[in-house]
């Protein structure tokens, strides 16, 4: 009995202390926590100010409140839990969804839900987002550095770029699998990837597969059996987007793997160990900048675009070239013609800060004979010309264009605008497949 009493007394004290907590104090803590979680999981689409972007509606203001007052704020909570984050519904605990819900209501000066969450529900207990395993990274013992010649003319058994060859052809010369034996193919191995939205093409070199997962996780696998050799998980800064949107490609060159991250940085990993070699911040993710595609190796320069450029800021959208050895930015080329530029008048009299868009959300291509990097740009933002103080006669260069860029200088050698003055969300930011004729 003495041993039982030893545990009962502290338990009674704990339960009594819980009852003495001030619900208002708990609610204030919830709103603070909700703000932090909103920044991490929601702000990329709905903005840090809750005013929305081209990718997510506004969560603040008269129209938003009137809509959900009619339906009931419980319906807002249910909708958020069932459909958010996109592609990762139910990612958070009930407690986290409630805290985000209360933060949104508080931001609209609306009474928040101060009801207690029932801790008998296991979903109310926050679970760590990281996978806990006993796995320890191993080292790729033998790996020959990837040369420019390899990049430009990859061995038939390797896939060294997003579409195998740097010209974007996406063609494999292998002939073992054909129309006669394809019916006999069988599953050799499978591997569960990290949850989330993904559109990646793995890279393969010397029997090693390099695979990027949602959440900016890169894995090195033995292509013969799927055995994990090493894994790198990018550590996001507080408040950055970690929704796990598409990371369409990574790049490989010499002894490094290159990845463009969700929080607008560029990193290089050691190809044998997966350890971080360098990191370069390209832009501030709090301004909306992010990556959904990665870099291309063009004549020894790591070239990549950026997106998330619908917000009104001075810098606008751009393409950068980086030194593969240390990540140093070699050049930066705007995809928006600014007022002082040669084609600045194609935006009418619009001030520089209001010239938005020109995102590059698909990787580029490269022609080593011409030494030109090709990439497509998306539309001007907002989509409707009149909302930008422009007309459809204002072509808004260099949006909806193909850009041909010297990868060593960043100079736009030539461009072609496919849809001048576009105003109905028809963009051309797709892959550029290069052919000789």
Predicted regions and their residues:
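Aromatic (tryptophan-biased) beta-strands that constitute blades/sheets of beta-rich domains
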Residues: 138-193, 227-239, 275-284, 328-336, ...
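Electrostatic cytochrome c docking/interface patches
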Residues: 22-37, 88, 143
């Amino acid at each position: 009995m003495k041993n039982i009493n030893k545990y009962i007394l502290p338990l009674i004290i704990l339960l009594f202390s819980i009852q003495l907590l001030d619900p208002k104090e708990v609610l204030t803590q919830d709103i603070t926590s909700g703000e932090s979680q909103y920044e991490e999981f929601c702000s990329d689409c709905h903005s840090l100010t809750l005013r929305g972007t081209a990718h997510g509606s506004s969560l603040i203001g008269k129209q938003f409140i009137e809509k959900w007052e009619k339906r009931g704020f419980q319906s807002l909570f249910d909708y958020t839990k069932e459909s958010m984050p996109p592609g990762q519904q139910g990612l958070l605990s009930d407690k986290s969804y409630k805290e985000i819900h209360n933060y949104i209501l508080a931001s609209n000066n609306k009474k928040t839900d101060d009801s207690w969450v029932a801790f008998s529900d296991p979903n109310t207990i926050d679970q760590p987002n990281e996978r806990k395993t006993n796995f320890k990274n191993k080292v790729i013992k033998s790996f020959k550095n990837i040369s420019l010649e390899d990049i430009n003319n990859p061995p038939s058994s390797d896939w060294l770029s997003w579409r195998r060859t740097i010209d974007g052809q996406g063609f494999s010369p292998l002939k073992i699998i054909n129309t006669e034996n394809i019916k006999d193919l069988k599953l050799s191995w499978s591997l569960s990837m990290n949850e989330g939205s993904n559109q990646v093409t793995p890279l393969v070199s010397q029997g090693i597969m390099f695979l990027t997962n949602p959440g900016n996780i890169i894995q090195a696998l033995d292509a013969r059996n799927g055995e994990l050799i090493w894994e790198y998980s990018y550590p996001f800064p507080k408040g950055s987007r970690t929704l796990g949107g598409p990371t369409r490609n990574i790049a490989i060159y010499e002894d490094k793997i290159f990845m463009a991250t969700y929080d607008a940085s560029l990193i290089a990993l050691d190809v044998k160990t997966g350890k971080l070699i360098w990191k370069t911040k390209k832009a501030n993710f709090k301004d909306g900048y992010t990556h959904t595609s990665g870099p291309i190796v063009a004549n020894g320069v790591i070239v990549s675009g950026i997106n998330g450029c619908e917000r009104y800021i001075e810098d606008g959208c751009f393409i950068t070239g980086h030194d593969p050895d240390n990540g140093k930015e070699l050049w930066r080329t705007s995809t928006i013609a600014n007022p002082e530029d040669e084609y600045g008048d194609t935006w009418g009299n619009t001030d520089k800060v209001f010239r938005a868009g020109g995102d590059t959300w698909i990787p580029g291509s490269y022609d080593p004979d011409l030494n030109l990097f090709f990439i497509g740009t998306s539309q001007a933002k907002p989509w409707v010309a009149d909302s930008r103080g422009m007309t459809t006669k204002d072509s808004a260069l260099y949006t909806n264009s193909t850009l041909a860029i010297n990868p060593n200088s960043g100079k736009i050698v030539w461009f072609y605008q496919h849809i001048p003055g576009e105003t109905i969300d028809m963009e051309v930011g797709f892959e550029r497949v290069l052919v000789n004729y």
